[in-house]
Amino acid sequence: MSEKYIVTWDMLQIHTRKLANRLVKKIHSWNGIIAVSRGGLVPSALLARELGLRCVDTVCIESYNYDCLKENRKIIKKAEGNGEKIIVIDDLVDTGGTAKIIRKLYPKACFVTIFAKPMGRSLVDNYIIDIPQNVWIEQPWDMSISYIPPLIQNYKIK
């Protein structure tokens, strides 16, 4: 995947608020949130704030190793229950591998993501941004802001 979609902290918050706006209409339906670790951790905090929910748990599924999608996903930890009155959130649905596990673990949950790629899109109940399948998403927690020297410093003035 050579093309990248860069997500800033501001854009993540804007997109998560859009998602919250869709979910707030059913606010009496929700008892809590399950964040899919690690991608859903930051969005879950933002979503919990916007919806006034205090109960946030995690399901930990190893899907990626840095920038490489793993074939065999491993459930490290799961939240209890079948997902009734729960929002499960991840940052992205990609090929659908993790989403299929989430659907089996929490069949009654409302599963949402910020970003959705074509192969996994049908597995989520709601999402905000369409992303082409061949595009890699760079999330703000995976990047750092660093100083870039001016170009002139590459040239010695004699």
Swiss-Prot record:
- Which CDD domains does this chain map to? PRTases_typeI
Q: Binding of Mg(2+): at which residues?
A: D91
Where, in this chain's numbering, is GMP bound? Answer: D94, T95, G96, G97, T98, W136, I137
Its Enzyme Commission number(s) read 2.4.2.-, 2.4.2.22
- List residues binding guanine: D94, I137
* Main subcellular location: membrane
Where it sits in the cell: the answer is: Cell inner membrane
GO molecular function term, any single one:
magnesium ion binding
Could you list the residue ranges that cross the membrane? none
Residues that bind xanthine, according to the entry? D94, I137
Needed cofactors, names only, are: Mg(2+)
Which reactions appear under catalytic activity for this entry?
GMP + diphosphate = guanine + 5-phospho-alpha-D-ribose 1-diphosphate; XMP + diphosphate = xanthine + 5-phospho-alpha-D-ribose 1-diphosphate; IMP + diphosphate = hypoxanthine + 5-phospho-alpha-D-ribose 1-diphosphate
Topological relation to the membrane, as annotated: Peripheral membrane protein
Assembly information from the UniProt record: Homotetramer.
Q: What is this protein called?
A: Xanthine-guanine phosphoribosyltransferase
Give the organism the record lists. Buchnera aphidicola subsp. Acyrthosiphon pisum (strain APS) (Acyrthosiphon pisum symbiotic bacterium)
What gene is it encoded by? gpt
